[in-house]
Amino acid sequence: MFGYVTASWKELTAQEQKRYGAVYCGICREIRQRSTGVGRICLSYDMAFLALLLMSLYEPEEESGKKACRLHSVKPRPWVDNEYIRYAADMNVALGYYNCLDDWQDDGKRAAKFLADKLAPFLPELENRWPRQLGAIQSCISGLSRLEKENCPNPDEPASCFGELMAQLLVYREDMWAKDLGQMGFSLGRFIYLLDAAADYDKDKRKGKYNPYLAMGMERDEKRWEEYLVLAMGRCAERYEKLPLVQDKALLDNILYSGVWVNYRGKRKEEAANDG
């Protein structure tokens, strides 16, 4: 379900591309240092958005540098680090673990079990460090699994379940920005879930998998789906624009106002081609 909240790369300036890559590399670097290199398999640009948002809001001091790694061994890549990069790395590991565990328990995917077993030793520390967020992830995964087994025909229920998860992830601490971050996260989570349901409609139909639009007996309706998405993103943007963001604002705007739509339409085009 992750992988949609990313930038439209072609629309970024060279400086924005460099910054975006440095944040991503910083998260990757922290995942390796704080857990295991295997955890980098779960690395997602969605968490780069989370880090960028919190960094723009709280403006922390940053450590930066350049370093080559196994994935990029020829040319050193720039990276940045701060407490929000580390937070995004922790959330990436936690989400990766519970997602893999769910894939193993529900679908019997052996690769998912292997990765979950590798990440499991790091969960107690994450639960101690971020009890609210880890509790929200567990609750969301459990809730979504239950709704899928019930073949829930109401898209609002699973969308709101995922919205609660994103609300908790965006709220780094309980402060004056927590309300706006939480409501932004809730709407963003609903957007992601509904986007994923629309993007995977044809694939889920072919494979007989749960999809709320299929469960409610809905035929493919691109126009209606996009109306749902515009509404959810509109509510997300309303809260987003209340935040006093300056640093990386253009990059964040690109992700929310362009990147998510480019990714959605690309996925729908791909699925329609596979269905045809």
Model region roles, listed by residue range:
Residues 1-183, 190, 194-230, 238-248, ...:
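Acidic catalytic motifs of isoprenoid enzymes
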